[in-house]
Design a protein with these regions (language model features):
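Outer-membrane beta-barrel proteins
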Residues: 4-5, 15-186
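Repetitive helical segments and hydrophobic/amphipathic motifs
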Residues: 11-12
Length: 186
């Protein structure tokens, strides 16, 4: 197991409508405890949301896999609402690796539940993709999350967000425990 310390800088562009944009720079793109870039990454996206709870967006990052994938594009949409003090978010995400034609692309149907600072997420992998379950808790700027990625392993992350002048910054620690199915544990 390797332990990682990340410095993430976020730049949010002001939005005068329901469309927003974001850009981030990170020392290593970590997703569910596993490195996706094996080094620095530049990331960004565009989001649309309206008052009904509907949202949609696109997000991208550079990645570095040994099979030739050099970029990731995620397309997503969903609907979020509150019911009896519980936040509910039902969404769909497509993960696309345009430079790779060996079947890395996959999709998930995601159900997120939240109450106060406590969150629970279920991601159901489609067409044979593994499922993922995560529980998270936040206390102010401090966040902790534990997830289990079927057939890959468990991950733990601890993060802290803060302001750097006019930017939102953060530090994160991530640890991954491999279940022995060939996951890249960084």
């Amino acid at each position: 197991m390797k332990k990682l310390l990340l410095l993430i800088t976020f730049i949010s562009l002001p939005s005068y409508s329901a469309v927003s944009a974001n850009v981030s720079f990170t020392s290593d793109y970590i997703w569910r405890g596993m490195t996706q870039s094996d080094g620095p990454a530049i990331q960004g996206g565009f989001d649309y949301a309206n008052d009904s709870g509907f949202y949609a967006g696109i997000w991208g990052s550079n990645v570095n896999f040994n099979d030739g994938a050099g970029s990731e594009l995620d397309y997503y949409f969903g609907y979020g609402f509150e019911m009896g003090g519980i936040g509910v978010d039902l969404g769909y995400v497509a993960f696309d690796y345009p430079e790779n034609d060996t079947g890395l692309d996959f999709e998930e149907i995601v159900l997120g539940l939240s109450m106060g600072d406590l969150g629970l997420t279920f991601a159901l992998g489609q067409d044979g993709a593994p499922d993922y379950t995560e529980v998270s808790y936040g206390i102010g700027a401090l966040g902790i999350a534990y997830g289990q990625y079927d057939d890959y392993g468990d991950n733990l992350s601890i993060s802290y967000g803060f302001t750097c002048g006019t930017y939102d910054c953060g530090l994160a620690y991530s640890d991954f425990s491999d279940d022995g199915y060939g996951a890249d544990e960084d």
